[in-house]
Amino acid sequence: LCQAAAAADVLVVTDSRHPVQAVAGARVVELDLPARIEAELAANLPADPAQATAIVQQRLREGGEELQRRIGRAYQDVAEAWGLGIAKVPAVVVERRYVGYGEADVARAVARIEAHRRTNP
């Protein structure tokens, strides 16, 4: 990567069905992470609603602040991706302004974005 790309603010938006090769310093947002966390909390629950509620509440307590942060961050990340107008995954966003779609190799996507920026200042 060129120094500009390495120093750039890089956000990768994907999901578990579209794995990416991230680069150091890039933040990866998985759009299906909130659903996966909810599935973890709901795994193997009994049919009785009262028992299921008690078990989920226990799991939330046991997860503590770390689980709460994880859930909150997952939803914040999804909201950020929507706010950026991400239309499909994988997407690589540089400096919250330039977006490349469809490239799972983040370094290659950033290089393409940088090449575009050089030829279209």
Q: Can you say where each PLM-predicted feature lies in the sequence?
A:
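Thioredoxin-like thiol-disulfide oxidoreductase module
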Residues: 63-86
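A short, hydrophobic beta-strand/beta-hairpin element that forms part of a small beta-sheet core
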Residues: 89-100
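Acidic/histidine-rich, surface-exposed loop or edge segments in extracytoplasmic proteins
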Residues: 57-63
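Extracytoplasmic/secreted cell-surface and envelope-processing proteins
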Residues: 21, 101-102
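C-terminal partner/receptor-binding element of secreted or periplasmic proteins
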Residues: 102-121
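Bacterial N-terminal signal peptides
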Residues: 1-3
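N-terminal secretory signal peptides
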Residues: 5-49, 53
